[in-house]
Amino acid sequence: MGKIIGIDLGTTNSCVAVMQGTQPTVIENSEGYRTTPSMVAFTKTGERLIGQAAKRQAVTNPKNTIFSIKRFMGRKYDEVPNEKKFASYDVVNEGGDARVKIGEKSYSPQEISAMILQKMKQTAEDFLGEKVTEAVITVPAYFNDAQRQATKDAGKIAGLEVKRIINEPTAAALAYGLDKKKENEKVAVFDLGGGTFDISILELGDGVFEVKSTDGDTHLGGDDFDQVIIDYLADEFKKQEGIDLRKDAIALQRLKEAAEKAKIELSSRTDTEINLPFITATQEGPKHLVINLTRAKFEAMSATLFDKVLEPCRRALKNSKLDMKEIDEVVLVGGSSRIPKVQALVKEFFGKEPNKSVNPDEVVAIGAAIQGGVLQGDVTDVLLLDVTPLSLGIETLGGVMTKLIEANSTIPTRKQETFSTAADNQTSVEVHVLQGERPMASDNKTLGRFHLGDIPPAPRGIPQIEVTFDIDANGILNVSAKDKATGKEQSIKIEASGKLTEAEIEKMKEDAKAHADEDQKRKEEIDLKNSADSLIFSTEKQLSELGDKLPADKKAEIESALEKLKEAHKAGSADAIKPAMDELSKVWSEAASNLYQQPGAEAGAAPQPETNGQQESKGGDGAVNAEYEVIDGDDDKK
């Protein structure tokens, strides 16, 4: 049985971890980093870049570089006006859903997220040396049903069976509390990430992690703080030069990177200089942006964002039915929790110094890996009791939302309630499923609708329609309605996740697999070209050193084979490169044998093209074996 990995699919960065025995391990990606930028780019040649590679080229390719896709997951086009405004890529309306347009093709947010998940899956497979097919994926606690289902769909497209969707602050609490022995510790997890904010109040004790309440804002995170700085820089430059940099995609991407860097620097310094030479040009010549930004100025500009952080904290505390002084620890999670003003607000609100013992960038993935270990049976004596973040109900007479499951109910849960018809001789009812806290149905999020028909005609109020809401451990909802008189039943699995059907998901899975195969083929081609390049270099080098010792006919054969390899390498055809390399290696090997047979030839002088070492080492640690010469070997041994 393969390992169940834990993935923190973040707005800005993603992270993957796995249980190694009884301890969770964060896995480094192929570039050597423990977190991977949640970015996908498409180059002019059609190559797909993910993570660090996508981030590196974002300035020169802003239109085709996708970031913060998590903010579009499970959302309708008309729900994301602000997110759309700040994206450098095109967000289009297709059937009411928000999709990303790259060239002639459009992608659902689930497809883009699946590409990031594929990268995390590959990272885990490289580390474990085995196929990975199962994962626990985290989501913001305040994600609604549609956003959770969209995340599950993304995992499926990436070739992963999502064993559990787990809330980010709950995952962080798992990581924080796994080794804690204190009984009944009450913990507030304050999670301010790249795009979302969650606050969860939990009680930990004797291996039980019970979520008392959760609240948050899915429109508040590091991106919003970056935007404050971007707007400030653009406004200042416009005042000075009369040019709006927001209208230039490349300049805007440079502003975005500079804003993120400035925000990070202001967490450890009181001021920073933002210096962007050649940001634009006019007839007068190039223009440069040089602006000094102080921490005090940044905090003043971000005042409304800081205010938005506290209201969910108040609601979560109230719903937990705990007193402020009962909270034992406040654990900071998410990269944006490093902002000094945020830490000061948390300290002031909770009346205690926040706990910074966990790595805010990695702790969520670690918690997901622990949950994977629990599901696999590797981690025992841990019971996780999570809650649903928002109330669930149906629309009833007068356009009112009638709640069946209240917010902060422990999941999994099942609730039944009996309703009746609103008119005489009514033979069908529409069940309009809603999620939210507002009293009127129209002010809440529609999760789905379905009809129950063939109800026997009767006076209003007589038929009995039993409606059942069933939430699984992932927080995903199933609803059914049954006419008690006839036993006729109708049900719906809520899948308002951008309306992806099973057929669409399967097609996207095939596309994703094809891309993965293409990526692997491209990597193999690059490795082959690099090997050819190395063989050309080493052959030329040793020909110049040993060419006069070779018979003329052998030297001519080598030069001819070398020329063929150069032509194949220049053409870039893998099919031509491989046989050309084999031919050159063969004729060189024959020539080397002749050298051995020459009088006075030393074993150490026999030429060896360095490609042999390189190719042989590929199956191991990727190191390249250097060309070497043994000199007085016996004397050097100690």
Curated annotation (Swiss-Prot):
Domain of life, per lineage: Bacteria
Compositionally biased tracts (Acidic residues): 629-638
Region listing for Disordered, in residue ranges: 592-638
Factors inducing expression: By stress conditions e.g. heat shock.
GO MF annotations in UniProt: ATP binding; ATP-dependent protein folding chaperone; unfolded protein binding
Sites bearing Phosphothreonine, chain numbering: T196
InterPro entries noted in UniProt: ATPase_NBD, Chaperone_DnaK, Heat_shock_70_CS, HSP70_C_sf, HSP70_peptide-bd_sf, Hsp_70_fam
Biased composition (Low complexity): 597-610
Keyword entries, A-Z: ATP-binding, Chaperone, Nucleotide-binding, Phosphoprotein, Stress response
Stored HAMAP family: DnaK (MF_00332)
Family label: Belongs to the heat shock protein 70 family.
Protein role: Acts as a chaperone.
Entry-linked NCBIfam families: PRK00290.1, PRK05183.1, prok_dnaK
Name of the protein described by the UniProt record: Chaperone protein DnaK
Annotated source species: Chlorobaculum parvum (strain DSM 263 / NCIMB 8327)
